[in-house]
């Protein structure tokens, strides 16, 4: 990382639709911190900064506590996005998707936000650079997964553009209450729901119930993991189409 970039601004004004500089590994003080080029790159950032941006910019307004790799997306000097990677909501559920997977053998893309001014292909490039960074920093990770939320009116076009495999969908219940959205887990998980769960349960009769599909995407980082996909529960399928198509 160039020493001439001491500060990072959380705005995105530069538009780069083409790769002008060959991407490469980014190091800082001898440590690998990311991958990319001057036009677009990902670098590790602090947890608090990633959470602050997600809380203010992401449509959910909520970060995931299970995230442990926080990547900023930079264009020139500007911080234009954040990707948070970590465990699934149930960390042990990875072995249900790909057999013989331990907690450090996979990652989930818990949250992703990119500035609206960035070109359309920036998301897939950021994911590509993030995967290269994961390979460098976490060589034990064999596959990654993420979910596309039907609430956004999309069926995962970003993951399709990033060459993820679609392995199925499931319907989830969401509650809308006083301008806030709650996943059904918040309602049912007494211990993990916290104050939000208590408030939702106390006001359940006022909440509006919504049901949306959640589309599961997976990207294998090696052939061995692909062969271990739990085909009793999941199978690679044609990409779904979004409601706007």
Curated annotation (Swiss-Prot):
This is Methylcarbamoylase mom. One of its GO terms (cellular component) is host cell cytoplasm. It catalyses: a 2'-deoxyadenosine in DNA + acetyl-CoA + AH2 + NH4(+) + O2 = a N(6)-methylcarbamoyl-2'-deoxyadenosine in DNA + A + CoA + 2 H2O + H(+). Its main location: host cell. Induction: Expressed in the late phase of the viral replicative cycle. Mom gene must be expressed very efficiently only at a very late stage in the lytic cycle because its expression is lethal to the host cell. Expression of Mom requires the viral late transcription activator C and the host deoxyadenosine methylase Dam. Dam methylates three viral sites upstream of the mom promoter to prevent binding of the host translational repressor OxyR. If the viral sites are not fully methylated, the host translational repressor OxyR prevents RNAP recruitment by the transactivator C. It comes from Escherichia phage D108. Mn(2+), Zn(2+), Mg(2+), Ca(2+), Co(2+) and Cu(2+) showed undetectable interaction. GO terms for biological process: symbiont-mediated evasion of host restriction-modification system; symbiont-mediated suppression of host innate immune response. Transmembrane segments: none annotated. The gene is mom.
